């Protein structure tokens, strides 16, 4: 029998941004390419990435509003052009940016006549308003308007519960989706066994993060989903045949469990899979690193202590915390100076 030789590409898989633009404060666009891929791989990656972009990325939004002396959602207030329902819909559209966890309170307290915009929202320091010009209400008379707001960080779309509140508190449909849309297309080239594909990925965001940031976060979320399948040992899988023959649970895969992978082959790949937000770093330190495009442990180890001290707002205490974590969990030291 004659064995047919199969040609396999030895080129490194690469991606790059081929187009990036800001259409408005609340509409960013980015176009990316990934190549070379084997036949069928582009569709596999494109479908998974689109789902992750639209459903796995967290966003921040207003989820509840409260104002006294409002009988019901569809009532009107003398001196305000919009109905209560219209004001709630305007609040729903406000684009926020934050790294908060849990619930935060905000408020609006103004006096008319006034054109009320997102700029009038008094929010916590951890919450940033992306477009301060977004319209909320128009006060046509000298009246006071005070609204208490609840802000949450979540993912996807959450329908508000039926409103049975009598205290002027109204839930708002939570749309925690920073990515407005995502499309992928495929270009094939070559022939026979050498046929390859290029994946084109288009991303539109609401301005709370860039398309590149969205692509990075979606990729990270996909990696986190698949890591348990890569590393879970047979003894870590607990079958519960008594309750349900088709159900099994996998032990949580913690940061500590990944340490063995670093000392194995493919060390660089393992380092790429460990993101700095999975460590014990304080929020301020994490945000400083993220702003400097340091997202993974590999990114961090490509810098020296001297490099980190050049980061804006970085302190010597932050360096010590990073060194302690690297030594404690990984047995790795960060050089003081860049080695050439």
Swiss-Prot record:
It holds the Pfam family RNA_pol_L. Residues 1-233 are annotated as: Alpha N-terminal domain (alpha-NTD). It is found in: Plastid, Chloroplast. GO terms for cellular component: chloroplast; DNA-directed RNA polymerase complex; mitochondrion. Residues 266-340 are annotated as: Alpha C-terminal domain (alpha-CTD). HAMAP family: RNApol_bact_RpoA (MF_00059). The N-terminal domain is essential for RNAP assembly and basal transcription, whereas the C-terminal domain is involved in interaction with transcriptional regulators and with upstream promoter elements. In plastids the minimal PEP RNA polymerase catalytic core is composed of four subunits: alpha, beta, beta', and beta''. When a (nuclear-encoded) sigma factor is associated with the core the holoenzyme is formed, which can initiate transcription. This is DNA-directed RNA polymerase subunit alpha.
